[in-house]
Amino acid sequence: MIHSLFLINSSGDIFLEKHWKSVVSRSVCDYFFEAQERATEAENVPPVIPTPHHYLLSVYRHKIFFVAVIQTEVPPLFVIEFLHRVVDTFQDYFGVCSEPVIKDNVVVVYEVLEEMLDNGFPLATESNILKELIKPPTILRTVVNTITGSTNVGDQLPTGQLSVVPWRRTGVKYTNNEAYFDVVEEIDAIIDKSGSTVTAEIQGVIDACVKLTGMPDLTLSFMNPRLLDDVSFHPCVRFKRWESERILSFIPPDGNFRLLAYHVSAQNLVAIPVYVKHSISFRDSSSLGRFEITVGPKQTMGKTIEGVIVTSQMPKGVLNMSLTPSQGTHTFDPVTKMLSWDVGKINPQKLPSLKGTMGLQVGASKPDENPTINLQFKIQQLAISGLKVNRLDMYGEKYKPFKGIKYMTKAGKFQVRT
């Protein structure tokens, strides 16, 4: 299946490679570099690239390309999902997944990759099992290993490897028993210049941090589970219970994990939390243009919109911009023609605005179309789809755990046409 794995930074340098079968020459990545040059952005590189003797499958996360090399046809999503699992494992082990961190922990990285694949086929991909096989690096363990010459490889077989719940090790004990769940929704939308919604959808996840003693059995119920589409679960979830009762029943892994991901595509269920009033005008035979935008809240259930950043790619004919923001700071790059306005929080009583003039090339024709406006924002304690957790119950253990639910909505690809 997977012959080799190459890690490539955004500059095109291969800084780590791992081979499970025969060694594949680095020259195979030349096909990937050619595709990278053709793509305008890193995210636009094709995930599957055929070559005369191999297939290259890649994911781009944390400014790193994870490129798998295979020689036989396999389901592409199978390989791509494994690559995402590799990234998540690195993040779980080291806190962050970045080029410097991977280089600093290169021995542990190779040990983890050796356990995750056996002769090119996925073997141990659960973080709990991997942490028993390969101990996560700590300052103390690094010092001890340096002095004694030992490694991070565990000296015992994982207790959960052969059990019916391989994602959870046995004998887990905590002084404070707690279970926290984060409902995070990302809204993608296109708004036309009249303010009507062209398309809108929500991608959501529920991330969990569970630190419970023993072998607890949890059930999580929702107030309105029917609005969830295209749901994908962690293997711990009992699917038949969800199909029949729309209740999540599971024995959780120990620590951090993603319980489920879901999709809300019905546009009548997608509320648009912000609006943009805009007035952008270019005149023929004039060296000046007018620019004015105002951002305000809409359908936020009284929650504050924060972390607002407005960006817009201006036409090539714009030489400079003289703008005044009512709040926040703005920048305009005359080379890339990119306007960026860091708004911060939106106060409903005093809506933020950015207005002024644009300097245009003398004699240049009027642009064919106005620029689009892209928004970034986040709203704490709000799931924009209306999803709400009803209750969390625990069975199989007698103690009473601490429980908490947190909601957050953030912008994905949120575009306003002008």
From Swiss-Prot:
It is a peripheral membrane protein. Keywords: Cytoplasmic vesicle, Golgi apparatus, Membrane, Protein transport, Transport. GO terms for cellular component: AP-3 adaptor complex; axon cytoplasm; clathrin adaptor complex; cytoplasmic vesicle membrane; early endosome; GABA-ergic synapse; glutamatergic synapse; Golgi apparatus. CDD domains: AP3_Mu_N. Residues 176-417 form the MHD domain. It is found in: Golgi apparatus; Cytoplasmic vesicle membrane. InterPro entries: Adaptor_comp_med_subunit, AP2_Mu_C_sf, AP_mu_sigma_su, Clathrin_mu, Clathrin_mu_CS, Longin-like_dom_sf, MHD. GO terms for biological process: anterograde axonal transport; anterograde synaptic vesicle transport; clathrin-coated vesicle cargo loading, AP-3-mediated; intracellular protein transport; intracellular transport; synaptic vesicle coating; synaptic vesicle endocytosis; synaptic vesicle recycling. Belongs to the adaptor complexes medium subunit family. Component of the adaptor complexes which link clathrin to receptors in coated vesicles. Clathrin-associated protein complexes are believed to interact with the cytoplasmic tails of membrane proteins, leading to their selection and concentration. Ap47 is a subunit of the plasma membrane adaptor. In concert with the BLOC-1 complex, AP-3 is required to target cargos into vesicles assembled at cell bodies for delivery into neurites and nerve terminals. Adaptor protein complex 3 (AP-3) is a heterotetramer composed of two large adaptins (delta-type subunit AP3D1 and beta-type subunit AP3B1 or AP3B2), a medium adaptin (mu-type subunit AP3M1 or AP3M2) and a small adaptin (sigma-type subunit APS1 or AP3S2). AP-3 associates with the BLOC-1 complex. This is AP-3 complex subunit mu-2. It comes from Mus musculus.
